[in-house]
Amino acid sequence: MARKFSAGIIALVLVFSLSVKAQQVKDLAPGVTRVTQGELDQFSPYNLLQEKPKTAAMAALPAVTAAFDPKSIRIEVTSRGTVFHIPLADSEELYGFGLQMGSFKQKGMRRRPIVNDNPLNDLGYTHAPTTFYLSTKGYGIFINTSRYTTFYCGTHQQIKGDVNTNTGAGASAQTVEDLYKNNNRSGEVIVDIPGAKGGDVFIFNGPTLKNALQRYNLFSGGGALPAMWGLGLQYRMKADSKQQDVYNMVSYFRDNHIPCDVFGLEPKWQTTAYSCSYVWNPEYFPAPDELIAKMKNQGIKLNLWEHAYVNPASPIFGALAGASGDYKVWNGLVPDFAGKTASPIFADYHKKTFVDKGVASFKMDECDNSNLSEGGAVWGFPDQTQFPSGIDGEQMHQQFGSLYFQAMYSNYKKSNKRSYFNIRSLNGFASSYPVSLYSDTYVHKEYIRMIPNSGFSGLLWSPEVRESASVTELCRRTQTAILSSQTVFNSWYLKSPPWLQYDRDKNNQGEMLRDSKDVESKVRTLLNFRMSFIPYLYSAFAKYNQEGVPPFRALVVDYPEDKNTYNVWDEYMIGDNVLAAPLADSAATRKVYLPKGNWYDYNNNKVYAGGQSYTISTGLTEIPIFIKEGAILPIAKPVEFVAPNTVFDITCYVYGKVADTVQLFEDDGTTFNFEKDAFNTTTLGWQNGKGRVTRKGTYKGKLYDIKNWVNL
């Protein structure tokens, strides 16, 4: 027995020695360290990344101060898979893991960021399963895998050496909750990846949380810069609308001066939708070229709904038959976007049929997976699906949205046209993608929470408006929508806009609200603010692109030294100077925490001292935002849509006697020419009671005309 025991110990020592020798540490980019061990997966997020890191911008960030020694990360490769042990201090808090819906702070939690179409829980299921988290200690961790992964965020202790005699929580438990409470704190994050034959982790160093997040976004290719028209309103028609219905609705918007830039068509525009044919339905849209032309004349861009499961009636079905998975979805093929054959076939057809004819963007649906919490939800392809490229169903599920988007957006890059898509799933390193995530869920508080949560992972989120229970709720949801990355009214099951009738059944029966014109006026006022806000918002996106600072982000990103911000999930920064605090559902008041410094209520210019909480009330047509003292806020005269020749007439509001300079990004708003330095930086300054404007750059056009200055 002793001989066998000794042999076992020797074997373990040898395995451990080999493991240590096999682990490699390498600096990958400025402030980014990679730690690897064993056999790495072919279809990892890093291997699938198409954009080049912006290393010059990464190098310009503050000097790196490592939060811990990369060699202290322990990677174990076993017969089950791979396990990471990553240091975690008691004093730090964690955030991220993609588009989390049911949670904000992640320390002390078990997280499984797995793609799911109805992620109504706090386990980690999500539309965007990003295996990336950030720490208030000033670093980010990205686990480079497309496999289903579980993170134990300081929840479990591994036995090392002698086992102590702690009796545990159950010994004195008085309630069921106490009985099952885990009081064990561990100094590590444990990451479990079944099936993986090796480990690959990227450390994004700070020195601050914000700097670490910037490095992640810049490593991903820089943040997204959508076409400027994408920041206006997108209105989606009822699913069974016909061509004349679209004309009538466009006329309604223009006749009533309701701002709108994009109209979206839902499933019935195709001959078959589940699965998709990608062929215009002649019964509903007999003249699609005429439709596109007429909408263009009205300043409206066209967005088409689809998903990537290819019906036998599709012209590309035959070509994709040998380049798809071995299971169908809704009797349609699942293209192997991870290979080299399917993407060009899929993309080329869309370019010739839609993009070249003027379709401006797409809504890419159903690219997540069936609801994992329900046994009867089985529409998605199974995890054991095999694809010609070698990727399996599990990894394809995690990457399907990102790969699908890459194929579709390549058409616009080839055509030198920027766009702004809608999508239901993305994975890691997606920061550069001009696309907002959406969900079929509809809990308003969760919609608000996902705005700051999205910023932790290089994602954009659209809290779309559908039906409501009251006028108040409709206005509150609209306020949230105009203070997000993409403002969408999704009326796919509503015959008329929800401001004419918020009740679904009454809306579709043609029974409008008695005060519908008054509600319409309220919504118009809110949408006009969105249009006035575009110059500021567009410039925030430009900073995202160039410096990696998310345009929408949690307060803790900017104020990590303030522990009061650690659990503020229902407020967020927009750009550098605006703090948004939306009201959920039909609330008349809410509590707001303001960080250090003085803050101005945008609606009445009342000044609040930071470092405190306040109870505020916001009217239905007011904007629930606070402006940082020392800011210059450019507010434009609202336009009904963004045209190629639009010039925004701007009034600059100066908050305080002394103000920092503010930069507006100026280019054509529609092409990638800015990547060749065809842009201007318009700097707004305030000195000695007077405003100053300086413009530098090579762009010959003009987006902004500074008309007035107001000192508050």
Where are each of the predicted segments found?
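Bacterial N-terminal signal peptides
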Residues: 8-17
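Catalytic-domain carbohydrate-binding cleft regions of carbohydrate-active enzymes
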Residues: 24-622, 627
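Accessory, solvent-exposed terminal regions and/or long lumenal/extracellular loops of proteins
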Residues: 627-712
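Bacterial N-terminal signal peptides that target proteins for export
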Residues: 1-9
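Sec/Tat signal peptide C-region and signal peptidase I cleavage site
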Residues: 18-22
